[in-house]
Regions:
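Metal- or metallocofactor-binding catalytic centers and their adjacent structured scaffolds
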Residues: 5, 37-114
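Flexible C-terminal active-site loop/helix
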Residues: 4-15, 26, 31, 297-369
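N-terminal basic, low-complexity leaders that serve as flexible interaction/assembly modules and, when applicable
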Residues: 1-64, 68, 362, 366-369
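Hydrophobic faces of well-ordered beta-strands that scaffold small-molecule active sites
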Residues: 46, 131-137, 160-162, 188-192, ...
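Conserved, mostly hydrophobic/aromatic
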Residues: 3, 34, 41, 70, ...
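Metal-dependent enolase-superfamily TIM-barrel catalytic cores that perform enediolate-based chemistry
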Residues: 124-236
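Shared catalytic-loop signature of beta/alpha-barrel
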Residues: 207, 213, 224-241, 246-340
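Glycine-rich, aromatic-flanked loop segments that form ligand/cofactor-binding clefts
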Residues: 105-137
Length: 369
């Protein structure tokens, strides 16, 4: 089997409502879609969701990199040779994880379709019976966040994740308001997205909310301050999760060496796809660290990829693959029942991609063959 063409689409996905985090506010999200065709006629789809604040890539840089620097080198390669393909990509471009993730995911979609297996069977088989997801609330006034959280609990959610990080004093009010609104039996996750920046600010906030029984605090300090994150972990009783500070093997080694986090948030867009994510899971298992599969608010394509990985690995205890719930348009359909994402058992990713929608939402596309 050989890759005979790769088509790259630069698309924009409309959100149901603005999504506000510590570093930006989004009204639509850029997504790079890859359509990979083989000489056997099998077609696989992949997705890259770049973010300058997280992956160091922009929408158009990712599109151009895939179109000019990566895709042409992969023509004639076998999608099953996934390690070789990653080596080719790494030799061609440094870092660029979401660009590489788009190719990686398309390869796994092809492999699953070629073997007649869902991707999770290529990763070890189904180890979890279901995938539960939290209700995610972006940065808003405390009373609005509390109201959304209460409504989510009434709708059947058992875990609430809130975004904070734009103002420490208001963040304390947000955390307290949401905890009061949802009671003590619902899990509460707090994500600062680097917004508290340093140890001093982080500890000032955490000392005021330690009684709020948070499941964890995620990435409170700047991404490259792993030493600072380790200090936070030493000074608080709240479990600490690293997100933006963890991309690949280099950061993982330092996190383990410095005992900088209790938990890790793996995102396919940060590490380069399913194949490198499996390596991070193995390292986390060696270090005894629990894993979450997070999301860059991706479409059904990359969300499905994360779901297949999550359901196949015992060390992955948490999932935040909620992107499809946040878009008014999508390229495919994933099924959610209350707080559960239903597993896709069809071959490949299990997503029936609507190519007409991909083309309609594209602002630019190119075919490499």
């Amino acid at each position: 089997m050989k890759i005979v063409s790769i088509e790259v689409f630069a698309t924009e996905l409309p959100l149901l409502r603005p999504f506000i985090v510590a570093y930006d506010a989004f009204h639509e999200l850029p997504s790079i879609i890859v359509k990979m065709t083989t000489d056997t006629g099998i077609v696989g789809y992949g997705e890259g969701m770049p973010d300058p604040h997280v992956t160091g890539e922009t929408f158009y840089s990712t599109y151009e990199m895939l179109s000019r620097d990566v895709a042409p080198l992969l023509l004639g390669e076998n999608p099953f040779d996934i390690e070789k393909i990653h080596k080719i990509m790494s030799a061609a471009v440094y870092h660029a994880p979401s660009a590489k993730a788009a190719i990686d995911i398309a390869c796994f979609d092809v492999m699953g379709k070629a073997t007649g297996q869902p991707v999770y069977n290529l990763l070890g088989g189904k180890v979890h019976s279901s995938l539960s997801v939290p209700y995610v609330i972006s940065i808003l006034p405390p009373e609005e966040m509390a109201s959304q959280a209460a409504d989510a609990v009434k709708a059947g959610y058992t875990s609430i994740k809130i975004k904070v990080g734009d103002d420490p004093a208001t963040d304390v009010k947000r955390i307290r308001a949401v905890r009061e609104a949802i009671g003590t039996t619902i899990q509460l996750r707090v994500d600062a997205n680097q917004g508290w920046r340093n140890v001093a600010t982080t500890m000032r906030v955490l000392k005021q909310v330690e009684d709020c029984e948070m499941e964890w605090i995620e990435q409170p300090v700047l991404a490259d301050d792993i030493i600072g994150l380790a200090e936070v972990r030493q000074k608080t009783t709240i479990p600490v999760m690293i997100d933006e500070g963890l991309h690949g093997d280099k950061e993982m080694r330092e996190v383990i060496m410095r005992q900088a986090a209790d938990l890790i948030n793996i995102k396919l867009m940060k590490c380069g796809g399913i194949y490198p994510a499996c390596k991070l899971v193995a390292q986390a298992e060696m270090a005894g660290m629990g894993c979450q599969i997070g999301s860059m608010v991706e479409s059904s394509i990359a969300t499905a990829a994360g779901a297949h990985l999550s359901i196949a690995k015992s060390m992955i205890f948490s999932n935040e693959m909620v992107g499809p719930l946040m878009f008014s348009r999508d390229f495919g359909v994933l099924t959610y029942e209350k707080n559960e994402l239903l597993v896709m058992d069809a071959p490949g990713l299990g997503v029936d991609v609507n190519e007409a929608t991909v083309r309609e939402l594209s602002v630019q596309s190119t075919l490499i063959q």
